[in-house]
Structures are given as structure tokens and as C-alpha cells.
């Protein structure tokens, strides 16, 4: 791990020395105000999960938990200044959200709405077990500096890194606080390095609700040409885990504007003794390891896109991500919908079909995606090594193409999920019918 960090630092230093390979981003800065941009995203979100065969983890007895739903409205603000002119440019940014629930939301959950401290099922006062918040606000500021083609940003940020990715699939995003350096000194090469010390999940008002001690990230992505790129990223989260990610993506152009896209991606994770996992089959908590990889092929022609994918786990624990302040969306793998198909030793296969109605000449902005994923050979400690799960997924999204409501979108998705009896424990998803409805209205301020 230390060698990987040293290599990243060496690449950054070398890149700075030879930065004349391309025009400097900083030399083209127009100014603090001139390059500024700001927007507000008004979002109405609804998530409903009907747990048709949920098993409570503490008692092992079946408990029917129906109409677990959350309904709320938010305004997500994103303001980012330009850089001052000069050899080194400086700027500031603000990200945040203000939200309120719609209705009582007595069965709120699904990481949508914060909850007060209340009594859990055993009558013990527990954070997040009480009533849902009526309204809440979160966010923070950040500062940034740029030299040549290298930018350093410190403060509250929404991250999009394969090993540390903010959850953006709920009402509001997950925020990390720390420092991220991004460098483009060498043409077609992006190098990143960073350190983060706070993690605020989507349904938390505490700026460090996930109690992150220290997470160091590093990595690089290189574009060989218009069709081939590869990347590597690493994460070292103190007392929690060490994770590595690799990806190779190749697009093969075909006749008649068609194409085949091949993708390989994978993670290796070693959990520290202090990490939380729920799918391990070993009693040695200091020796929990997981390898997960996936390959996919997608064929695109006109309005049609068909993808097939295969995903496989190995080790003595599943890919238990998101529970150790390692990002609620740190799963850049194809078989991820309601379920991620990341069980211990699990194998899964998927077929997906997408249709762009605009390219059919029917209704520009309308897209439909449907998929079926089947997982097998899941190990459940002291129970079985052949559990199964399956999911049938559908999503329709419409984006307004022009006029005063341009870029506003409505997204409706449904998942029909079922698992074998051995995979119904409360640590897992359990048989679920899920609906998600999101209405997004972006407003550009400047």
C-alpha cells in the first residue's frame, strides 16, 4: 500500500516537471467571478420497499414489514467559483441541501430521511430508531487552488471515485470532508490523491455520522485512444479496510454506427479487525478478504443496447461495502441494482436491454431499461453454500429536451427481488418489491 502511494506521488512530481506537454488550465483562467457557476436542483423523491418475507436478524422469526416508504422534497445547492488569475489560482465552493418530508413518513427508511433517537425493537434507546425529521439541512464549503493543470480542493465534497464514491441514489448526496488533488499534467492521464476525515451519509445530519477516522485514496486513469482506457484506484481506511480497483474498457466500432463495448472491472478488499462485515464465513476477523470481478459485453445499434455480464466473488467474506465509511456507492460493477449480487462466493449473470425512444423518432428524452440478474452459490455461514437470489429490474426516465423546463426529468424504477430461504436473514435484503420515483428540476443560477 505504501509503495502504491509513493508511486502516485512520484507520478505527480514527474508530471509537474513535464507539464508543457499540453496547455495549462490555469493559464486560461478567466477569473474568480467570470468562471463561476451555480445551480439548485429541486428534487422530489419517493422510495417504497414492501418486504414480503423479511426475517428479523435478532430473533430469527419472520416479521412482515410492509409499506416501508419515504417521501420528501429537497433543494440541493452547488456553487463553485472560478479561479483567480496568476501562476496559482484560488477559488471557493459551497455544496448543501435543505429538505422536508412530505406526509407522516412513519415507516421512513431506505437512507432517505434522518430519524431521531428512539427505542429499538428491544426497547433500547438507539440513534435512528425514533420519529423521522420534519425538516433538515446539511452541507459545507470548500476551498481550492490550481497550479498549471493540477487542482487541490479541501472541504466538503461529493466524491465519484470507484473506491470512495458518495451515495447519490437517494434524496440527497453523501458528503465527505477532506482534501483531493486532481492532476492532468500529462495528456490523457488523470492522477488523483486525497485524504478524507469525515463521512456524512445521505440520511445523516451529523457531519461525521459514519465516524470516519482517516481514508487515503490514490489512483490514475489513462485514455490510450478514443476507444480504450484503463484505470486503477486504491483506498486505505484506517482500522477498517484496504481496497484496490482496476478497470479496462474497450469500444469496438462496427458498421452502421454500431459498436461492441467490452469491460472488465474488479476489486480486492482486505478488512481490518475493526471493520464491520455481515457475510463472513471465517471466525478470524483479522483475516477477512474478498475478491470480486466482472466482465460485460454491450452491443449498441441505433436506439437499442443489449448487455450481458458475469460477476464473481471469492474469499471468506462478500463485498461488504458502504458500512465502513467507504462510500455508499463504491461499487462500479455491472450487476448492481436493488441487490448488488455481492454475497460470499456468489456468482451472478445478467442480461440487460435499453431502448432510446428518441432515436426511434417517437419521443426524444424517453429511455427504458430492463434487466434480469440471477445469483447462485452464495455461502451463508453455518447454513448453506448454495443460496440463490434474483432480480427483475425496470426503469423509465424522461428528460425534457427544450423550453423553460429543459433538463427536468422524471425517473420511475421498479425492482422485483426474491431470494432463497437461507438468504432471507435481516442482514440481507430479503424478498422485496421496490418502487423509486424521482422528479428532478435543475435551475441554473449563473
For each of these PLM feature ranges, what is it?
Residues 166-173, 199, 210-212, 235-245, ...:
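Solvent-exposed loop/turn segments connecting transmembrane beta-strands
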Amino acid at each position: 500500500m505504501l509503495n502504491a502511494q509513493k508511486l502516485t506521488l512520484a507520478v505527480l512530481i514527474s508530471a509537474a516537471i513535464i507539464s508543457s506537454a499540453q496547455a495549462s488550465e490555469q493559464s486560461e483562467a478567466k477569473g474568480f467571478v467570470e468562471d463561476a457557476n451555480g445551480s439548485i436542483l429541486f428534487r422530489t423523491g419517493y422510495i417504497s420497499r414492501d418486504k414480503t418475507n423479511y426475517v428479523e436478524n435478532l430473533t430469527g422469526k419472520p416479521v412482515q414489514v410492509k409499506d416501508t416508504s419515504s417521501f420528501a422534497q429537497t433543494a440541493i445547492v452547488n456553487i463553485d467559483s472560478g479561479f483567480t488569475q496568476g501562476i496559482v489560482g484560488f477559488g471557493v465552493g459551497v455544496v448543501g441541501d435543505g429538505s422536508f418530508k412530505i406526509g407522516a413518513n412513519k415507516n421512513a427508511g431506505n437512507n432517505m430521511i434522518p430519524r431521531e433517537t428512539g427505542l429499538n425493537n428491544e426497547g433500547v434507546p438507539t440513534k435512528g430508531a425514533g420519529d423521522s425529521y420534519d425538516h433538515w439541512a446539511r452541507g459545507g464549503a470548500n476551498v481550492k487552488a490550481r497550479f498549471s493543470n493540477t487542482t487541490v480542493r479541501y472541504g466538503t465534497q461529493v466524491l465519484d471515485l470507484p473506491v470512495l464514491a458518495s451515495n447519490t441514489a437517494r434524496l440527497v448526496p453523501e458528503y465527505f470532508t477532506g482534501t483531493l488533488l486532481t492532476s492532468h499534467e500529462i495528456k490523457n492521464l488523470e492522477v488523483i490523491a486525497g485524504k478524507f476525515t469525515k463521512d456524512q451519509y445521505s440520511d445523516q445530519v451529523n457531519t461525521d455520522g459514519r465516524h470516519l477516522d482517516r481514508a487515503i485514496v490514490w489512483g490514475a486513469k489513462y485514455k490510450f485512444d478514443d476507444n480504450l482506457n484503463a484505470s486503477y484506484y486504491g483506498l486505505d481506511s484506517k482500522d477498517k479496510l484496504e481496497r484496490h480497483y482496476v478497470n479496462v474498457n474497450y469500444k469496438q466500432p462496427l458498421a452502421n454506427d454500431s459498436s461492441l463495448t467490452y469491460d472488465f472491472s474488479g476489486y480486492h478488499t482486505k478488512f481490518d479487525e475493526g471493520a464491520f462485515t455481515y457475510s463472513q464465513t471465517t471466525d478470524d476477523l483479522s483475516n477477512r478478504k474478498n475478491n470480486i470481478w466482472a466482465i460485460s459485453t454491450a452491443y449498441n445499434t441505433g436506439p437499442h443496447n443489449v448487455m450481458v455480464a458475469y460477476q464473481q466473488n471469492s474469499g471468506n467474506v462478500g463485498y461488504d461495502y458502504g458500512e465502513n465509511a467507504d462510500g455508499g456507492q463504491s461499487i462500479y460493477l455491472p450487476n448492481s441494482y436493488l441487490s448488488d449480487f455481492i454475497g460470499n462466493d456468489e456468482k451472478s449473470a445478467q442480461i440487460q436491454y435499453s431502448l432510446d425512444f428518441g432515436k426511434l423518432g417517437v419521443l426524444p428524452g424517453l429511455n427504458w431499461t430492463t434487466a434480469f440478474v440471477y445469483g447462485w452459490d452464495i455461502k451463508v455461514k453455518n447454513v448453506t453454500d448454495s443460496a440463490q437470489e434474483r432480480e427483475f429490474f425496470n426503469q423509465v426516465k424522461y428528460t425534457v429536451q427544450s423550453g423553460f423546463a429543459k433538463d427536468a426529468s422524471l425517473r420511475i424504477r421498479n425492482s422485483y427481488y426474491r431470494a432463497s430461504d437461507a438468504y432471507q436473514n435481516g442482514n440481507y435484503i430479503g424478498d422485496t418489491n421496490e418502487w423509486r420515483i424521482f422528479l428532478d428540476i435543475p435551475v441554473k443560477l449563473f
